[in-house]
């Protein structure tokens, strides 16, 4: 479970870092540090919850809540209160992505995979691709392009 969780954490960090770096370059590096720290805290909570039993939906919500509180603390501690609102918007979008990933992972039965195999990895890529396709179409509708 730890190995699979570490691979998922690394995948999520890359998924956050790639578009962030493409859009903002190194100017958004501190945001990447925030999100990396948040994900590490969330991963630690996930592992702690996973030791007692298999983490379910309530445990995932607890991880997201702790992640949100960590984001608020880091934003206030490092940058002052003026960046809390943009960071919360960014965290809200990330929470939507994470919730969609969890829901689609349940649909594709990723929790039933016993080990981090090629089959698991291909299913995970499919889940991520579907999630970002849905979000992209939604963003196009919000901007009035479609």
From Swiss-Prot:
The keyword Transmembrane applies. It comes from the Archaea. One of its GO terms (cellular component) is plasma membrane. Its main location: membrane. It is found in: Cell membrane. The chain crosses the membrane at residues 5-27, 32-49, 61-80, 90-108, 120-142. Keywords: Cell membrane, Membrane, Transmembrane, Transmembrane helix. It is a multi-pass membrane protein. This is Uncharacterized protein AF_1584. It comes from Archaeoglobus fulgidus (strain ATCC 49558 / DSM 4304 / JCM 9628 / NBRC 100126 / VC-16).
């Amino acid at each position: 479970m730890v190995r699979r969780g570490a691979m998922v954490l690394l995948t999520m960090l890359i998924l956050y870092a790639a578009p962030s770096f493409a859009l903002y370059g190194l100017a958004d590096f501190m945001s990447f540090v925030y999100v990396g720290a948040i994900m590490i805290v969330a991963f630690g909570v996930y592992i702690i919850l996973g030791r007692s039993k298999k983490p379910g939906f309530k445990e995932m919500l607890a991880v997201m809540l702790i992640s949100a509180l960590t984001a608020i603390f880091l934003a206030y501690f490092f940058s002052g209160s003026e960046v809390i609102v943009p960071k919360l918007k960014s965290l809200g979008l990330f929470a939507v992505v994470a919730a969609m990933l969890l829901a689609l992972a349940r649909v594709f039965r990723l929790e039933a995979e016993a080990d981090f195999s090629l089959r698991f990895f291909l299913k995970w890529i499919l889940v991520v691709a579907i999630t970002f396709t849905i979000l992209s179409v939604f963003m196009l509708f919000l901007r009035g392009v479609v």
